[in-house]
Regions:
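NAD(P)+-binding Rossmann beta1-loop-alpha1 motif at the extreme N-terminus of oxidoreductases
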Residues: 1-50
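Rossmann-like NAD(P)(H) cofactor-binding subdomain of soluble oxidoreductases
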Residues: 53-125
Length: 125
């Protein structure tokens, strides 16, 4: 299964790392300096309880193109950012979209993507 985690904040990075550690084919969509940092040095996450930093060499992309194909896209963005990516999701051929977060507009988000299988989830770290 080919997975894209769309969003490289705290929750998105943790989700991508967990998929990666489980042996899944995961790619992380990140932008700007953060994308360059992950590409160069790997995804580095400081352990909450132990004095260590894990490094995961997760593939990184900086955009989602219409022709990119994934089995599922996990969208892990702030609520205020969701409106800016709906057209990108509509144009992409991936059918399965999971919005991870508070999902205060769940019905509206699903209605905005009528050709997609839209699901909602809440992440725990």
């Amino acid at each position: 299964m080919k997975i894209l985690v769309f969003g490289a904040g705290v929750l998105g990075c943790n989700l991508a790392r967990n998929f990666f550690r489980a042996g899944k084919d995961v790619t992380l969509l990140a932008r700007g300096n953060w994308a360059a940092e992950i590409q160069k040095n790997g995804l580095r996450i400081k352990d909450k309880f132990l004095p260590r930093i894990s490094v995961s060499r997760i593939p990184v992309v900086t955009e989602l193109k219409p022709e990119d194909r994934y089995d599922v896209i996990f969208v892990v963005l702030r609520y205020t950012q969701l409106g800016t990516i709906l057209e990108t999701l509509r144009e992409n051929q991936t059918k399965n979209i999971v919005f991870v977060g508070n999902n205060v507009r769940a019905e509206a988000l699903a209605a905005d993507l009528p050709e997609k299988n839209v699901l909602f989830a809440f992440a725990s770290s």
